[in-house]
A protein has these predicted regions:
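Conserved C-terminal "switch" segment of AAA+ ATPases
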Residues: 2-82, 92-101
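C-terminal engagement/docking regions of AAA+ P-loop ATPases
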Residues: 65-170
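Short, surface-exposed linear patches
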Residues: 1, 21-23, 128, 134-135
Length: 170
């Protein structure tokens, strides 16, 4: 089964984001108070963000024996399950916001962080210790993979470095 491209991702999102879900009033207002148009826009903007080729969505760099290097982005590893997880996170964020006294309804402000969190959870996906596996993943089965380097910079600014007190060491 091929990985979904952006159009297929929009189709998958439409299975999980429907007009029967509560939508944030700001998002509704931005789309003429039309739930169908709001859902369409949320799906389009979310898929565009998910499939963006930016520095923060770079995942790995594969070096081939004869043809040079290729950059893979998180989008290259997208799946229906990943999209389902993004929507589940989005719903969780919306419910938590509402329970904390915020406005009810799913918003683009819930979807975008859900993408980042899903990508962050999948940071350990690539096994960079065995470059030969990447020939299969990259679709260049006849190419010899000589190196795989992680390029993960996603959410780097939000990673917390903590000072911990000394303790016992084994």
């Amino acid at each position: 089964v091929d990985r979904p491209d952006e159009a297929a991702a929009r189709d998958i999102f439409s299975k999980y984001l429907s007009i029967d879900l509560p939508l944030h009033p700001d998002d509704l207002a931005n789309h003429g108070d039309d739930p169908k148009e709001t859902i369409r826009a949320l799906i389009a903007e979310t898929a565009a963000e998910m499939y963006a080729k930016t520095d923060r969505t770079k995942f790995i760099e594969v070096t081939y024996g004869t043809t040079g290097k290729e950059i893979f982005y998180f989008k290259d590893f997208a799946s229906g399950a990943m999209i389902e997880n993004i929507v589940a996170r989005t719903k969780k964020y919306a419910v938590k916001r509402f329970l904390a006294g915020g406005t009810k309804g799913i918003s683009l402000r819930d979807l975008i962080p859900a993408i980042a969190e899903e990508y962050k959870e999948n940071e350990d996906l690539p096994n960079t210790t065995d470059p030969s596996n990447w020939a299969l993943i990259s679709g260049k089965r006849s190419e010899r993979v000589t190196n795989v380097k992680s390029l993960i910079d996603l959410l780097a600014s939000s990673r917390l470095v903590e000072d911990v007190s000394g303790g016992q060491y084994l």
